[in-house]
């Protein structure tokens, strides 16, 4: 559905009694509405809430699609870093000040994969450091620790197994 001044809004119909507006990643706007709600009523609702939608869109950053090329800027631990990609004898990734040096063995090797594995290892070391500090204080000791890509949360825990799972995106935050 197109709303003047806002743009395209995705309408999701569910078995609910009220309408909800959400601005998601990449500045994607959608409204969840009752199945019985008419298009006209949804359009009026969105028009009434237009100021809120525009204010929220202004605060929401655009989705960043990285290409993992030489000279590209990324966020690492809350600071901008520059990728420097070069060929070499083995796949490696190192941090040198504000520069991330990525060495790729062959052209078929994915720079993204090397960078993500390195980021995952770095985040694991940071998380383990914090867990050691707080586990003793709280008297609770976790089982397994995993790092994975998560869209909707920063982490989770499994009470039965003691597993702690953290979002890979935490590596972009200032710790």
Segments the model singles out, each with a brief description of its role:
Residues 1-175:
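Active-site-proximal or metal-binding-adjacent scaffold patches in catalytic folds
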